[in-house]
């Protein structure tokens, strides 16, 4: 019988207090700052990998340290990046707090589609393709809201593994693909022409070619350009950007970063997306702050 059997007691996975001090003797805060201070995502990952190998070799005989080494390096990285931002006002890629990464845009890069556009912001790149069809191709919706039975404009977002240097198999849309696609779709709906003005079904597909932060807002920019390339008479041009919040020990100690990259997203306290035209804001996301 299993009744009254002794409970299994698991060992704690907490990082020993002395471990951070021992790590800093091998990798100083200045060395960690130098490792993360680069505008190239791959170079930064190589630097952290080299630090990990160095610490694995140094702690080869300490099983307790090796068991939590990955988390300890992550926390060390996080503290370093947050200190750089809050105290020194220095971002990992050298930008100012309100500075946007270099932009590039191109339309009509695919000849045999109705509309196409490529939008690049730093190391984030999206290719969007728009297809037009008759109203008979409108999407029928059988949902909980009886007032919404069809959808004329559809935006689909794809995030293949190769965009972040991975080789895993894609098994259909996940939470990220559905959420990002809906976000970019809602950003463009207010500027679309009415059915009377433009009697077509519209489908936009955003393919992520490279990802280092805010692919949803890059999809908004790319889909806006591809809609115009397809001849859709939108009411205004729409752009989107992701901002990040980093907080200190007091309520007055905080910074809002413009155009966050992946590292700032991971180590920050909150990120929020903003889309709009030259006249004002169209869409704003307000996620819950992280612990």
Where are these regions (language model features)?
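Conserved small/polar residues in nucleotide/adenosyl-binding loops
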Residues: 2-12, 284-291
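Glycine-rich, flexible beta-strand/loop modules in the N-terminal catalytic cores of phosphate-handling
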Residues: 114-200, 286
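Alpha-helical support elements that line or immediately flank enzyme active sites
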Residues: 128-130, 219-231
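A structural-propensity feature for long, helix-poor, extended segments
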Residues: 149-170, 175-178, 182, 238-283
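Phosphate-handling active-site elements
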Residues: 195-198, 229-240
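A short glycine/serine-rich beta->alpha loop
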Residues: 169-174, 206-214
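Extended amphipathic alpha-helical scaffolds
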Residues: 14-148
